[in-house]
Amino acid sequence: MAMYEFCGTFSVFRPSPVVEALLESIDSSDLLPRSFGWRRVKSSSGRKTDLWRREPLIELGELGQFADAMKSERGGRRFARAAKRVTGVTASPFEVQASMLFSTQRCKGGEGFSGLANNERIPLSASARRIYGKSTCYADLLFDVPNGASPLIVECQGKVVHDDYDSAISDSDRTTALQQMGFTVMPLTYRQISDQANFDTVRRMVARQIGVAYRSKSPKEIRCEIDLRRNIFIDWTTLGR
């Protein structure tokens, strides 16, 4: 999870009251440029959140090179295995959790779905641009489906930035534009993955869309899934403690 955050375009940071007051003072006095590197995410209602946008701290390729160089050190092989499980550049804890649930091997508690990439850039066709009003969009989770079937895009609908009317309209236009280009788009909410019963329905839907015959998990795989879920559905501000 830490590797995803290092390679991602987000950080989770909850300022103390003292730091919060200092940030407000700096913001109101314009002491720092608006693009100083970190940008705080606000909800559609203007509420400040603990989610921040920034450039990746380390590139995926750099992580892989470091992991290879550390293999001979204590814990190095385990570190290298973990690095290989990072599916791409994510933009939120929600995307990390969904990616880990879908891509982690079944023997490690996940679904073992292959062909998953994160935040893939998709240039829009002329007709799709007319619908969405933009020339490019990014797929939260993109499954490359074999045999010429429609690629599956799973869109993580986080409540922070998707909880008002304007966001709903924008999401709808974006979905329509992608569907016009032949993509299958599946909206995903946090509740659908955090609730295990709901997620059972979701994973079967994803399996069907990517052409995988879903096989029910063995008792051992179920225990591994419980362990995985316990480890990833945490207060992200406590990660690494």
Predicted regions and their residues:
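Nuclease-adjacent, charged terminal/linker segments that flank catalytic cores
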Residues: 1-66
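Surface segments flanking catalytic/ligand-binding clefts of nucleic-acid enzymes
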Residues: 46, 50-241
